Amino acid sequence: MNKRRIGILLSLAMMLGLASCGEKEVNSKLVLNEVLIENTDNFQDDYGLQSAWIEVFNKSYTSADLAGYQLKMSNQAGDTATYFIPKGDVLTMVKPRQHALFWADGQPNRGTFHTNFVMDGTTATWVGLYDSGKKLVDQVTIPAGALQANQSYARISDAA
């Protein structure tokens, strides 16, 4: 029981630390809409594999390009992985009110929508979306152990 309390306290401390890192979000067409960390029976990628995923939503009524943006993820303070969304792929242009799904599988060689990091639900997970000017666009922190397998952490409705 004490280990669980300590784990919860550490998770809360990490979330507070990440939330107070002083970066101000810029207004953007694109937002982090949904995150699924433990994918055992959910969407499959083009290779038939199930991995954690991050959904980015274009909340505007015009197309928005993710090329040059960055997805960042951290499971512990001071240790942030960064995935640079490549330029030159027409699929990074997200149509109005549509989604782009990124696989957090640590396999960027599989294509534009496969990140160089994996997510672990046993610790608090912070995910940030940065624009091509390296300004924070949106962020979310998923508390440790908050989700069961195949349960996503999402906005109440798209872009809400």
Predicted regions and their residues:
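Bacterial N-terminal signal peptides that target proteins for export
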Residues: 1-9
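Short, intrinsically disordered low-complexity segments
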Residues: 3-4, 14, 96, 154
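Bacterial N-terminal signal peptides
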Residues: 9-17
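Activation on beta-sandwich/Ig-like modules and their edge loops
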Residues: 21-160
